UniProtKB/Swiss-Prot annotation:
Positions that bind Mg(2+) 1: S93, E226
Source species: Rhizobium rhizogenes (strain K84 / ATCC BAA-868) (Agrobacterium radiobacter)
InterPro entries xrefs: Anthranilate_Pribosyl_Tfrase, Glycosyl_Trfase_fam3, Glycosyl_Trfase_fam3_N_dom, Glycosyl_Trfase_fam3_N_dom_sf, Nuc_phospho_transferase
GO biological process: L-tryptophan biosynthetic process
E.C. no: 2.4.2.18
Protein name: Anthranilate phosphoribosyltransferase
Binding positions (anthranilate 1): G81, N112
PANTHER family referenced in this protein's UniProt entry, alphabetically: ANTHRANILATE PHOSPHORIBOSYLTRANSFERASE
Residues noted as binding 5-phospho-alpha-D-ribose 1-diphosphate in the record, renumbered to the chain: 81, 84-85, 89, 91-94, 109-117, 121
Domain of life: Bacteria
CC cofactor: Mg(2+)
Length: 338
């Protein structure tokens, strides 16, 4: 049985693990071969010292090796946030994902129940009528037939059960808050990834570059793990193997500045109702911010040349009923397991 102790000793000594050492250490963690106190100590030592790009790459590699994979088209995109920004907004990436699917780009969305808000994407999708507890074949069919499939993280990363109790007991952020969005079970190489703190924007773009991602924007928007309409969004874009950084404002999307209070969500029931209201034509701050995130996703996917074009396509998807049709089709296919 492999031992975590040598790796624990290194990080306790503020030494950095190589990529391979991190892979080995996380393999031990996710194989149930470390004690709860070792897991807690290891995760906090990393957190206090600060996780490096190589350590995150090694950890993601271990996590991907253990996940339950899903088949998806090569051009599928994931629109996902780390969660943990503490603001409890509506499920912005969820609505953006349906808009993108309605615009004709396959979406392989990975997500979980709420971490710090009252409703994560899984909570809201469950209320909408989407069946979460489905196998990889059904999810692949959802992506093929509805243009969007939802992968419920805990079903695809069962090895996480070995670290779950320690994470709950620690009650604070660990490296695992970053890993989930980097371990998409469908292997999506295109991604809009929102992070909970600005210092992670560039490092996570570097991680995804090292993991051979194709086209990615890592974003943090004025406190949110989304592109925001409440202020400035920091972006690290990975395109053609190169990372460039820039900032976006609501004006770049042709949108007015919004107040955070107008984006405050509730529980799964409230958030599902808000999402359906936008699908029914309600024009509000939730619609605007979701359109902005969808527009960026359409640029990442190569479907739109510019954010202006992306906004036009996204609005067409919503206003034509294509977004609502993608949702209804996903509900139907996810509940039909024949």
């Amino acid at each position: 049985m492999a031992e975590l102790k040598p790796f624990l000793a290194k990080v306790a000594n503020r030494e950095v693990l190589t990529r391979d050492e991190a892979r080995q250490a996380f393999d031990i963690l996710m194989s149930g071969e470390a004690t709860p106190s070792q897991i807690g100590a290891f995760l906090m030592a990393l957190r206090v010292r600060g996780e490096t790009v190589d350590e995150i790459v090694g950890a993601v590699t271990a996590m991907r090796a253990k996940m339950l994979p899903v088949e998806a088209p090569a051009d599928a995109i994931d629109i996902v946030g780390t969660g943990g920004d503490g603001f409890g907004t509506y499920n912005i990436s969820t609505l953006a994902a349906f808009i993108v699917a309605g615009a004709g780009v396959p979406v392989a969305k990975h997500g979980n129940r709420a971490q710090s808000s009252k409703a994560g994407t899984a909570d809201t999708q469950s209320v909408l009528g989407i069946k979460l507890d489905i196998g990889p074949e059904v999810i692949a069919r959802c992506i093929r037939e509805a243009g969007i499939g939802f992968m419920f993280a805990q079903l695809h990363h069962s090895s996480m059960r070995h670290v779950g109790p320690s994470r709950v007991e620690l009650g604070t952020r660990t490296i695992f808050n970053l890993l989930g969005p980097l371990a998409n079970p469908a292997g999506a190489r295109r991604q809009l990834l929102g992070v909970f703190a600005p210092q992670w924007v560039v490092p996570l773009a570097e991680v995804l570059k090292d993991l051979n991602a194709e086209s990615v924007w890592v974003v943090h928007g004025n406190g949110l793990d989304e592109i925001t309409t409440t202020g400035t969004t920091s972006v690290a874009a990975l395109e053609d193997g190169k990372i460039r950084t820039f900032e976006l404002t609501p004006a770049d999307f042709g949108l007015a500045h919004a107040d955070l209070a107008d984006l405050k969500g509730g529980d799964g029931i409230a958030n599902a109702a808000a999402l359906r209201a936008v699908l029914s034509g309600e024009k509000n701050a939730y619609r605007d911010i979701s359109l902005a995130n969808a527009a960026a996703s359409l640029v990442i996917a190569g479907k739109a040349e510019t954010l202006h074009d992306g906004m036009k396509l996204a609005a067409q998807s919503l206003d034509s009923g294509a977004t609502a049709a993608a949702l209804e089709k996903l509900i139907a296919v996810s509940n039909d397991e024949e």
